Amino acid sequence: MYTLFILSLLCVLVTFSECKYPTGPIYPHKPIYPIRPVRPDPCPAVCLILCHKGNIHDKNGCPICRCRPDECALPLKVGPCRARFPRYYFNFMRKRCEFFFWGGCLPNKNNFETIYDCQETCGYAERRYPYPYIKRTY
């Protein structure tokens, strides 16, 4: 019982870091390895797959994931109406913004008025890896 109290007291005293394992109060130079992660990964799984080359790191050395928003992975949707509004969408397979005529109703979020808006939102298409599901190591 006394041991359990000491262990729970140590757990309270441990300082946590976002990216590194915490260190204990008795031996500050030795890391304490938690049973489960301290925090979930700041980048969701889809971000880790779709992130482009050249991620940056914050002051603690944690990667800051700059990911393509979800709307960029949506398929082209012209809609059921018969108007012909010039629009752009991000072609996920080709990794670039492409022109299409939108019907005028029921769009999805992968529908941009200008190529600039498309590139700004889904951007870095020209600088992306040729295959998004292969993780390169440098």
UniProtKB/Swiss-Prot annotation:
One of its GO terms (molecular function) is serine-type endopeptidase inhibitor activity. It comes from the Eukaryota. One of its GO terms (cellular component) is extracellular space. This is BPTI/Kunitz domain-containing protein 1. Residues 72-122 form the BPTI/Kunitz inhibitor domain. Disulfide bonds join C72-C122, C81-C105, C97-C118. It is found in: Secreted. Pfam families: Kunitz_BPTI. Its main location: secreted. Keywords: Disulfide bond, Protease inhibitor, Secreted, Serine protease inhibitor, Signal. CDD domains: Kunitz-type. Residues 1-19 form the signal peptide. The keyword Thylakoid does not apply. It comes from Margaritifera margaritifera (Freshwater pearl mussel).
